[in-house]
From Swiss-Prot:
Gene that this polypeptide is encoded by: Wls
Protein name (record): Protein wntless homolog
Membrane topology reported for the UniProt record: Multi-pass membrane protein
Family note: Belongs to the wntless family.
Keyword Endoplasmic reticulum applies: yes
Amino acid sequence: MAGAIIENMSTKKLCIVGGILLVFQIVAFLVGGLIAPAPTTAVPYTAIKCVDVRKNHHKTRWLAPWGPNKCDKIRDIEEAIPREIEANDIVFSVHIPLPSMEMSPWFQFMLFILQLDIAFKLNNQIRENAEISMDVSLGYRDDMFSEWTEMAHERVPRKLKCTFTSPKTPEHEGRYYNCDVLPFMEIGSVAHKYYLLNIRLPVNEKKKINVGIGEIKDIRLVGIHQNGGFTKVWFAMKTFLTPSIFIIMVWYWRRITMMSRPPVLLEKVIFALGISMTFINIPVEWFSIGFDWTWMLLFGDIRQGIFYAMLLSFWIIFCGEHMMDQHERNHIAGYWKQVGPIAVGSFCLFIFDMCERGVQLTNPFYSIWTTDVGTELAMAFIIVAGICLCLYFLFLCFMVFQVFRNISGKQSSLPAMSKVRRLHYEGLIFRFKFLMLITLACAAMTVIFFIVSQVSEGHWKWGGVTVQVSSAFFTGIYGMWNLYVFALMFLYAPSHKNYGEDQSNGDLGVHSGEELQLTTTITHVDGPTEIYKLTRKEAQE
């Protein structure tokens, strides 16, 4: 009688497989920690105040802070008064990147946040619920002498959230407000060498545009992009892991189709998990080096969402298939209460992502958080997804508890068995618990390394060796889930190892009433397999 490989594998072989996977896991962490640089780099920019004295500002004129055709600059706002320069004539210009540097497609994306330096003036204070309106133009070029090409031009509103900690008296004039940073721009590809931002703050007192926003002294930006070195390591990992998971997936399904029965639910779910892992592994990002694909960030979010939804569904079905009655198991409809929250939560996060990054495909300055309605809508989606996640977690904890309780109850039958049979099923129970604990360990490691990467300084030093913690987190966790899926497809593939006829009627099969099972893999056409019978509840219980 054949079962899953995990049922027929000796403890020694299981430990060897576990040791090999552990070695690959350590290598995955070391690749990120020792070879790859930090995942991202943050570059501060201070906008240069250029002067555009044309009477008509409707036609875009690019004002560069430096270079062959640099603009006429002023150092501060006070310098504009004697020169009779109006607020509408001042253009805040930012050249990306800094002098003597170039952007690269290996940077993958650009994210910018905005910081305003606003001075307190008694006659020009920030009013309540103040909103700044910026006229922003984004241009690009690929050499230092060609003309700028417009990439985007939008009116960008942002709500100011500023506090002034000192008393609002004349002696405190000139001190700066404490203002929250504002989301400014996100681009899903870096296809050009140079970018130019021109930010205008048009003032219209009749329409109350940019009135009551205080005296803006400077505009500062922080640009965040992925490091090219990390991108190359990341692409190399995806290129290596894609065929690895694909080959084991084909091998797994081939062994299932060789059986004389149709696949059971757990086998189908494991195969679907392998497909979702392969989908997230396929290194389509290589094409972003040669093509201006701004949708890659959104596509990456969708791929991750599909994988995690499949992973969460697998955990539920894996537990359920080891605790349900015979007629309830092997049907996805029996899990609608548990899988339903996963579907609802995933759909909410998908809609939220489409409302944010989907719109950014045409307007890189858009942010759903900049308006009250957008903020409430985003929070609603996130809260619903959070509630679904909590419900899922409660369902999962309850099902895991039920599985272990059923196993503990059935273990009382083991002493009455023959020694060979008892040792066989004790091994099955051990392997089932082992796999459950490995699942818990993977989830715990994901959370722990995420927290460590957030609270650490980004890297640790031991003598002359520098370990990039954040990079190790990304490569290690990514490698870990690949190894997890690999192990599932390998251990739960049907085994071609059969027990002899004498054993079937002897030590391993003395009485039909003693027949016990740990997995839901059906070993022959007529009956269920070994782990299932051990863990399923009897209908009368």
